[in-house]
Amino acid sequence: MATEHQPGTRYRETFARAAQDPAEFWLEQARTLDWHTPPTRGLDYDGQTSWKWFPDGQLNISYQALDRWVQAGRGEQPAVIWDSAMTDQQVTYTYAQMLDKVSRFAAALRAHGVGHGDRVLIYMPMIPEALIAMLAVARLGAIHVVTFGGFAPREVATRLDDAEAKAVIAANGGLEPSRTIRYLPNVAEAIELAEHKPQVVFIKQRPEVDDTIDAFNTEWLDFDEQLAAHEPVEAVPMAATDPLYLLHTSGTTSKPKAVIRDHGGYAAAAAWSLPNIYNVDAGEVMFVASDVGWVVGHTYIVYAPLVSGATTVVYEGKPVGTPDAGAFWRVVSDHGAKMIFSAPTAYRAIRAADPAGEHWQRYDMSALETVFSAGERLDEDTYHWLAKVTGKPVVDHWWQTETGWPIVANLRGLDPMPLKPGSPSVPVPGYRVSVVNPLGEPVGHGTEGNIVVELPLPPGAMVGLYGEPERFYSSYMAAFPGYYETGDTGYIDEDGYVFVLGRSDDVINVAGHRLSTGTLESVIAEHPTVAEAAVIGVADEIKGQKPVAYVVLTADADVDAEQLRAELVAKVRHDFGAVAAFRDVDIVSALPKTRSGKILRRTMRSIVEGEDVSAPATIDEPAVLDSFAQQATRWEA
């Protein structure tokens, strides 16, 4: 039976138009862009695994992001605000300034042999030059391959080889609260390890980092000198279907998958999503606390804001410790951001350090309209804490590296709808979402299953995996023909709201019962002294697997460990059921996570089951892995 939470008429009509005639719907949206050759066809689709959006159109996304706003008289509007808590700097770049820098650096790249279709690896921290590099590569029709700053040399080498990058653009280092991450040794070692050698290397030399080009390789080029030495060049018209970038997923396989995104479809999706999902328009300020090395940074720090004529805040700092748990609120206040978007792990860190939300009260937050969250499931306890402290709508939404922009969201610009804690709301127009059983058959409302999306995927989503068409099919389409397999489990309720319970590989089997660790974590995280929780399944002789919870306490927690265990066991039994057979709790100081905030559950499981473990390349703080290993109980089978 439907409830008062049903989505509104405007949403339903828009979704229906996008579902019934996706080619015409997206062709209409694409007319908001400034095309070199406007498309006459919205979509070519073979009915199986190949689709092309705007196949006869031509544009360049760098032109969309910069030139057209300068030509429209917005040249003096701020495009990028760099806010570095690490260097105590705030620097604003207008659209005209960004266009000049991007055009000059594109000329430098061209002078050193970079052109249409060449791959360029970018390895930089959260500095404006990262955006300049990305847009300059795109301007030439080359393909950028952004690799998260601070990745170990072997990970960088893997991406160098996979992309066969002609050039590398890097900085000499990144800044963390307790250390400097030296990039140049990593670049040098990565090139040595890689079978494929880049022809040219550009280095942005930051004065805060001691390492210099001369100490490593005198043939490497200075980023700033090269930019200054060249005259601006025009953007190269590109087929809408030409690749814009490769972005490697941090999957569980030994070889990361390189997602391909195109110019035209991505530009159209970015331009549509910003006003409709985030309610951000040209001239407004947005703060996305992520990194350009991840998909969130690509789409909502770089491309969507600039393609839409908005102002994007590039933040170099942490949610806590730079200098305190008010860091995000300070950034919002300083720059008048209309929205903030970060991962639940960041919000949980703020809550753990400032449970009463005292830092929020220190700042003028009147410009802020909405608090967005994505990257992992937003547990209800964190949701309610954020809503109470901020007094703003707290909007979860769900998407993936592969999709490039949200699959499920509460469309705050198109048609704001009631929020349901635990749900990122409804499928975004363009994404026809279903829940199916292992045989691919749709299941009823409220029934858990595999979340899938009907093909073809909309503009902005991946169009393939670089050099691996067979893997593209086997990874995403083989299991459920006609659908994209998201790899997540969940259900859709009677109002059409989607509830994402976790990765299908985050399901544990306890005595024949399949249990979602995400649901268990949500129940545990509701306890007032628990700041964060992770549940993993460990081997058990009787039940096959049993759930074990690892909890991080709030800063003001004062509780006996055995008392807490008893309370959590009782809570899970009451809220989830005895079927969980839950009775094991460990208190730890921190949970091992990737740099994008995802909990390393597989690594945790390996540690507690006594396996030899090396720190994954994606880990944020290697020291946390050591402390977890010391604090966690062993569960060897």
PLM regions: where:
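Conserved AMP-binding/adenylate-forming core of the ANL superfamily
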Residues: 62-63, 80-135, 152-157, 215, ...
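Conserved pre-ATP/AMP-binding loop-to-beta segment of ANL
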Residues: 76-78, 201-204, 214-248, 255, ...
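Structural core segment of the AMP-binding/adenylate-forming
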Residues: 135, 139-225, 336, 343-344
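AMP-binding/adenylate-forming catalytic core of the ANL superfamily
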Residues: 148-173, 187, 333, 340, ...
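AMP-binding/adenylate-forming catalytic domain of the ANL superfamily
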Residues: 199, 203, 542, 574-599, ...
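Conserved AMP-binding/adenylation subdomain of ANL enzymes
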Residues: 267-285, 295-339, 352-358
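Gly/Ser/Thr-rich phosphate-binding loop
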Residues: 310, 338-342, 351-418, 432, ...
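Conserved ATP/PPi-binding loop(s) of AMP-dependent carboxylate-activating enzymes
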Residues: 426-430, 441-476, 515, 612-613
